[in-house]
Amino acid sequence: RLEQTDYMAYLVMDGGQCAGYFSYGAASHGGYKDFSFCLNSLYLLPPYQHMGLGRRIFAQVRQAARERKLDSFFCGCNVHNLPARRFYEKMGGVVGEIDDGHENLAEDQMYFEFCTGEQI
């Protein structure tokens, strides 16, 4: 990804400790519908969850999409990751498509669609 100019990746740090990571920009695992912008990953270690960090990160991603003059973006989520699904719903995500039923449950994905005009 170093050569890709529309892909941002961040480490979330707490002093010298890594608390998580997130990335956004061009979709890293293929496109979805006609969306050009994607929250590719968002992960916070359990001690850093439920502290408002995810909401702040999401606001940064939404702002980055706005700065690109986009009115929407998407993210993929494993169907079986209920905490992540609840988070994306709280952030205003609407389920667009679900691709489940795979033998390997890690391949079961759903796609959330977001508007950049919504405030969180």
Residue ranges and their predicted role:
Residues 33-36, 51-52, 106:
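Non-catalytic, surface-exposed connector residues within folded enzymatic/regulatory domains
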Residues 45-59, 68, 79-86, 90:
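Conserved glycine-rich acetyl-CoA-binding loop
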Residues 89-98:
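Conserved acetyl-CoA-binding loop of GNAT-fold acetyltransferases
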Residues 106-120:
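Terminal substrate-recognition subdomain of acyl/acetyltransferases
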Residues 1-46, 58-60, 64, 101, ...:
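Acetyl-CoA-dependent GNAT
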Residues 65-76:
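Conserved GNAT acetyl-CoA-binding A-motif
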